[in-house]
């Protein structure tokens, strides 16, 4: 008398018996079991509309990135509830329009091409589609979600001095003053261990009159005087 919804009630158990015109039972009761046949009336639904993952730059093809998951209220043991995944688009499309692939049954996303470089592309956006009926493009119902993949930094760029020679000066007998500011550039992500420069004086100061430390904000090398310098004895240090 009313429409049936398998997702609400998948099976009905009825008990029936026959009676005569006077209402007396003429047969023993019998059990009737009615199974509601599933119809493909539910689209796949992703657990999240936006999925976030990460992968180190320079990762080899076949590196696992993340897993996306969708569910379907239809019968999971029938075609109506059997899902398949695929990537609809990738942005940006460099260095290849197919940097990633997805396992169509599990939703696992892995790298499929080399060339991930954080200094060139820091983030990829994939549109993922889930389709029931085992991915049938004609009869299956579909839904989409977004996968955002961040390319994380690795230490693949050395610091480079901005000049071959730096100059400084200091009055004699002064200590704890900055005499030179050495500047470097590093293409790795700022304020990470891959970016932080460590300086040392490798020659030209046998008596240890100078020290150098890193400015944590600018990454510059700050040369300071730690022992008094006599102008009449030493007029220049290289």
UniProtKB/Swiss-Prot annotation:
Keyword annotations: Calcium, Cell adhesion, Cell junction, Cell membrane, Glycoprotein, Membrane, Metal-binding, Phosphoprotein, Repeat, Transmembrane
GO molecular function: beta-catenin binding; cadherin binding; calcium ion binding
Residue ranges occupied by any Cadherin domain in the UniProt entry: 1-46, 47-161, 162-238
Entry PTM: Cleaved by MMP24. Ectodomain cleavage leads to the generation of a soluble 90 kDa N-terminal soluble fragment and a 45 kDa membrane-bound C-terminal fragment 1 (CTF1), which is further cleaved by gamma-secretase into a 35 kDa. Cleavage in neural stem cells by MMP24 affects CDH2-mediated anchorage of neural stem cells to ependymocytes in the adult subependymal zone, leading to modulate neural stem cell quiescence.
Membrane-crossing segments per the record: none
CDD domains: Cadherin_repeat
Glycosylation: residue positions: 52, 104, 181
Residues of the signal peptide: none
Main location class: membrane
Record: residues binding Ca(2+) 3: 40, 42, 72, 80, 132
PANTHER family reported for this sequence: CADHERIN-2, CADHERIN-23
Main function: Calcium-dependent cell adhesion protein; preferentially mediates homotypic cell-cell adhesion by dimerization with a CDH2 chain from another cell. Cadherins may thus contribute to the sorting of heterogeneous cell types. Acts as a regulator of neural stem cells quiescence by mediating anchorage of neural stem cells to ependymocytes in the adult subependymal zone: upon cleavage by MMP24, CDH2-mediated anchorage is affected, leading to modulate neural stem cell quiescence.
Domain comment quoted from the record: Three calcium ions are usually bound at the interface of each cadherin domain and rigidify the connections, imparting a strong curvature to the full-length ectodomain. Calcium-binding sites are occupied sequentially in the order of site 3, then site 2 and site 1.
Name this polypeptide is given: Cadherin-2
């Amino acid at each position: 008398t009313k429409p049936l919804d398998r997702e609400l009630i998948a099976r009905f158990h009825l008990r029936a018996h026959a009676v005569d015109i006077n209402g007396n039972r003429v047969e023993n009761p019998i059990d009737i079991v009615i199974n509601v046949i599933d119809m493909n009336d539910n689209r796949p639904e992703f657990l999240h509309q936006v999925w976030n993952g990460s992968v180190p730059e320079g990762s080899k093809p076949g590196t696992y990135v993340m897993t996306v998951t969708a569910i379907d209220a239809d019968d999971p043991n029938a075609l109506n509830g059997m899902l398949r995944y695929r990537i609809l688009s990738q942005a940006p499309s460099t260095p290849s329009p197919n940097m990633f692939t997805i396992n169509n049954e599990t939703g696992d996303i892995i790298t499929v091409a080399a060339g991930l470089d954080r200094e060139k592309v820091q983030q990829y956006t994939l549109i993922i589609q889930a389709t029931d009926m085992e991915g049938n493009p004609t009869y299956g119902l579909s839904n989409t979600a977004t996968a955002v993949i961040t390319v994380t930094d690795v230490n693949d760029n050395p610091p480079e001095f901005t000049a071959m020679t730096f100059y400084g000066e200091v009055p004699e007998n002064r200590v704890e003053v900055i005499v030179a500011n050495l500047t470097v550039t590093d293409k790795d992500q700022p304020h990470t261990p891959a970016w932080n420069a460590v300086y040392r004086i490798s020659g030209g100061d046998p008596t240890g009159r100078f020290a150098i430390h890193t400015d944590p904000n600018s990454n510059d090398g700050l040369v300071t005087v730690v022992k008094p310098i006599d102008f009449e004895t030493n007029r220049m240090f290289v």
